[in-house]
Amino acid sequence: MPRVKRGVQARARHKKVLKQAKGYYGARSRVYRVAFQAVTKAGQYAYRARRTKKRQFRQLWIARINAASRQNGLSYSRFINGLKKASIEIDRKILADIAVFDKAAFAVLVEKAKTAL
């Protein structure tokens, strides 16, 4: 069986990992073994964070809608229920945006939700 030399592939793999670890502190950006562990862990954190980001933004939108609807005399759950009964289909992201940047329009939505209840 002939001898297989894998120096080129190993060098390329090491360079790839070290390039991904650029900007890390100390040995994490210079030593392949440590950099590989750091890059692997960073990938796990990134995978997890892509999922938690969705939950966190939804929580933020709900908190903003709740605060704005309470200023207009209605709780969040009753406000959402009123919108559903009034057949107004605006998602929470847009509702939160309206609540922050256009308080008059949000007040109109709250009034429509109140009349539908």
UniProtKB/Swiss-Prot annotation:
The keyword Repressor does not apply. One of its GO terms (molecular function) is rRNA binding. InterPro entries: Ribosomal_bL20, RIBOSOMAL_L20_CS, Ribosomal_protein_bL20_C. Gene3D superfamilies: 6.10.160.10, Ribosomal protein L20 (1.10.1900.20). It comes from the Bacteria. Keywords: Ribonucleoprotein, Ribosomal protein, RNA-binding, rRNA-binding. GO terms for cellular component: ribonucleoprotein complex; ribosome. The keyword 4Fe-4S does not apply. One of its GO terms (biological process) is ribosomal large subunit assembly. Binds directly to 23S ribosomal RNA and is necessary for the in vitro assembly process of the 50S ribosomal subunit. It is not involved in the protein synthesizing functions of that subunit. HAMAP family: Ribosomal_bL20. Belongs to the bacterial ribosomal protein bL20 family. PANTHER family: 39S RIBOSOMAL PROTEIN L20. This is Large ribosomal subunit protein bL20. It comes from Vibrio anguillarum (Listonella anguillarum).
